[in-house]
Amino acid sequence: MKAKIQDLIDKEIDAIKNIPIDGIIEKAIEILFDRIHQKKGKLIVSGMGKAGQIGMNIATTLSSTGSPSVFIHPSEAQHGDLGLIQKNDALLLISNSGKTREILELDHLVKALHDDIPVIALTGNQESPLAELSKVCLFTGNPKE
């Protein structure tokens, strides 16, 4: 049992070590600094399923450390929650495939309201529609689940 637990921990460590940390992270931080701290906006985080759960954790953690952030469920956004999104905000859209329909639709709806809101994508697919529409794509790699 201890060997299995250690193996799981080792796999998690390897996955974290293999996350690319080139200049892209700096670009994402620049967007967040500009939108949240200089323009007094907030980070809007969204994802479906497991990606949504991760997004909720990100938004909660950022808010608790003083960086205004909220999670919006992409389906709920289409039914009234878009009013939370303001012109100085930034979007963090999370989808492992980068093809999640609701996430792509959310981007379309937000751009119709505020066409200059920057999108930061968190995805495992650099060739996806989500990666293409984003200003910054944080590629997670393809770690084993």
Where are these regions (language model features)?
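Glycine-rich phosphate-binding loops that contact phosphosugars or nucleotide phosphates
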Residues: 33, 42-145
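An N-terminal, well-structured beta->alpha segment
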Residues: 1-41
